């Protein structure tokens, strides 16, 4: 008896060690994926700065007319299959069952969908160009169409590797994709700008195609190297075909994922069809309408997206642990982690929004020196309006992620569908009668409405509001903005005002946040840069440590 008990304890201990190892591997893989995603998104946002300086407002308008159509067909070509594949592979791997048949079926479906979407983009290029109100974009659609097929195949490899808990290829492929696009796209557009604007735009789009091709080569190489190593280690998998039931199950899993994924690209697609045409009805020429659309969707949106990417990356890093807490029905843990996600959005989003509103003209003149004074003035006004999207879009997307983590995807879909519908109607009306600023107002309205609905949905599910102290946070943001206005009035040089104002605003905001206790001692261990947070908390709220 003692011997069997001892053996039982040993087996139990071994199982516990294996579970701990698995958890550590998942956490490590998620960390690698998050880092790669942040780097890739930041590179993607930075890419548009030199591109705008080369293409100018009108060229950027052409580029931004083409890209939403490309993004929409890119989502349609994947249809949620990669995410469904990663889940199925992870499940089969955990139970020791073969998963290659799912990978083969997914790759076949992705190749077919990608091929169809690429051909449709190529065939309908003229139609899209006419609908958008700028016939010159026709050539851009022809150039970008092969990338849709390549993206579909790449996404299949990414889904498979993620299901295998091997996150490095996905993280590296994201970075490779952006680096090649940045280097080649900027180089080609610079070399071709002398031949004409559409040539330079096509050069940038060719850079996108080449980046996807290089990424695909990397993913294929990684897959076969891994397969060869597995064979050398004696790992072989029996080839089987999927049953009809398995195909239906995979499709059912992919469908809701695809619905959520397609909504934002669909909104941008509507913008590309509406804004230029409404501006022309407003009385602007085709070139001016394209240039103004380029200012809104290019330099302005790029600046707004930078803090949104950073904020969402920090917040979403906490979201997987919300799913884990839901599995254990730990309500207190769910509320703590959810509140922290949302608090990060407001703590970081509010100062960025006010800073953009105060220093819009300074930022744009420093970052986009090639824009003429009229374009800078229009872009500055657009940025002052769009600055509020930093708060609403980041918080809205965190709420959507939290709802998905709680298996309430239908509420996420409802909030986005309602918001996109309102934005589309407002764009049709406001841009037609007020000009390009109507497009910015419609975008802000969309973010605000989606945030309100998703917030209400979360309250309905959990019974608690998450965003305490938002009023105090807004007051602190106003004080920070006033200090920025003071610096701007004292320093006439835009570069000096921007640099000094940045430092003053950061110091004032951080000091007031800790002074008013918006970050508690209990929350600091869960925040990024914990040591720095502790140091600032001790320095500013020294009486708490007496």
Task: List each model region and its residues.
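Membrane-proximal transmembrane or re-entrant/amphipathic helices at the cytosolic face
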Residues: 2-13, 489-546
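Interfacial/gating helices of multi-pass transporter permease domains
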Residues: 52-72, 197, 201-205, 245-253, ...
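Hydrophobic transmembrane helix module of multi-pass membrane transport proteins
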Residues: 114-266
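Membrane-interface junctions at transmembrane-helix termini in multi-pass inner-membrane proteins
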Residues: 151-173, 388-418, 429, 433
